[in-house]
């Protein structure tokens, strides 16, 4: 999610990645019911509302208290917002008795620009602030707390699995040794330690890039959240309802791609296995069809470099 805004007041300035493309892919119906699973600062929500008719409805979700505060500027009666993780979207829809009636779900994955740009959130190695990294600072433990209690093996696993960090063991050892003598509580402390412990620097990439991504993903259970959100979207979508998902790195995109691919196939039956038509029907069929994939145009990347790695994928719910 890259939704650039400088403040959390009424003076919003949006640079949502693939804004028009992501919303257009939902095929907005005048009287449709839509979910923006990642409100951020409302770039996608506002565009969806502008395309809905008087009977349309938009339900937004975000676990960041600052996003919930930002949503107060939208007074449109067709709009409502839920404070919570998007992984629980099916639960929210069940409570509203709208399962099977949702015409589109939009998910803009990852960390947002306001989160990255606010030093107090602790997401960025470029700005010194508390070593937090929680998308909802009221829940769970901070990055600093986790790094203090985690073993070198656990830290190395996180750096390797979620950051694809080639020097994971070396960096994990340095983190644990530092915390034994002088616990780290600031982002700059962690970024400097990683930079000093890294034996190799990639061109045009800070040595702490992969590690900060990995720790953030782990602290927020981001990949598990995505998997649950996709399952939830499939549960609540109406026939011909659309799923529109923007991802920002290969781990996210792999989950989305594999989910769409898996649900776009019918039951996998070994050749020659004797099954009746009734048995085949009982195994279920395809529930999604892939509608397409898009990358940001060069002009958008030039204007907003954070869009460079984004991938937008669409799928449509099939009638059962």
UniProtKB/Swiss-Prot annotation:
Principal location: cytoplasm
Annotated residues for binding of S-adenosyl-L-methionine: 42-44, 62, 86, 108, 115
A cellular-component GO term for this protein: cytoplasm
InterPro entries: RsmH, SAM-dep_MeTrfase_MraW_recog, SAM-dependent_MTases_sf
UniProt keywords, alphabetically: Cytoplasm, Methyltransferase, rRNA processing, S-adenosyl-L-methionine, Transferase
Catalytic activity: cytidine(1402) in 16S rRNA + S-adenosyl-L-methionine = N(4)-methylcytidine(1402) in 16S rRNA + S-adenosyl-L-homocysteine + H(+)
A single MF term (Gene Ontology): rRNA (cytosine-N4-)-methyltransferase activity
Top-tier EC class: transferase
Record-level GO BP terms: rRNA base methylation
EC number: 2.1.1.199
Location relative to the cell: Cytoplasm
Annotated NCBIfam families: 16S rRNA (cytosine(1402)-N(4))-methyltransferase RsmH
Role according to the record: Specifically methylates the N4 position of cytidine in position 1402 (C1402) of 16S rRNA.
Family assignment from sequence similarity: Belongs to the methyltransferase superfamily. RsmH family.
The protein, known as: Ribosomal RNA small subunit methyltransferase H
């Amino acid at each position: 999610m890259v939704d650039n805004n400088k403040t959390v007041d009424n003076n919003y300035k949006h640079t949502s990645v693939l804004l028009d493309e992501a919303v257009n892919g939902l095929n907005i119906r005048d009287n449709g019911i839509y979910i923006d699973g990642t409100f951020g600062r409302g770039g996608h929500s506002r565009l969806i509302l502008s395309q809905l008719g008087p009977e349309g409805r938009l339900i937004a979700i975000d676990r960041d208290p600052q996003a919930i505060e930002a949503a107060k500027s939208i007074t449109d009666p067709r709009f409502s917002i839920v404070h919570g993780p998007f992984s629980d979207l099916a639960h929210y829809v069940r409570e509203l008795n709208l399962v099977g009636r949702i015409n589109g779900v939009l998910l803009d994955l990852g960390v947002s620009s306001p989160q990255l740009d606010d030093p107090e959130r602790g997401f960025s190695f470029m700005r010194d602030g508390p070593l937090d990294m929680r998308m909802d600072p009221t829940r769970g433990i901070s990055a600093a707390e986790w790094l203090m209690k985690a073993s070198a093996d656990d830290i190395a696993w996180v750096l390797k699995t979620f950051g694809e960090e080639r020097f994971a063991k070396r960096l994990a050892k340095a983190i644990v040794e530092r915390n034994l003598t002088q616990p780290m509580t600031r982002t700059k402390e962690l970024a400097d330690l990683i930079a000093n412990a890294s034996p190799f620097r990639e061109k045009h990439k800070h040595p702490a890039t992969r590690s900060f991504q990995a720790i953030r993903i782990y602290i927020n259970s981001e990949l598990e959240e995505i998997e649950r959100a996709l399952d939830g979207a499939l549960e609540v979508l109406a026939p011909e309802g659309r799923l529109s998902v923007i991802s920002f790195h290969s781990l996210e995109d792999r989950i989305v791609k594999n989910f769409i691919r898996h649900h776009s196939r019918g039951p996998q039956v070994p050749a020659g296995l004797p099954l009746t038509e009734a048995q085949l029907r009982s195994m279920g069929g395809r529930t999604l069809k892939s509608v397409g994939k898009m990358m940001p145009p060069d002009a958008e990347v030039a204007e907003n470099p954070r869009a460079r790695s984004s991938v937008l994928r669409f799928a449509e719910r099939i009638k059962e």
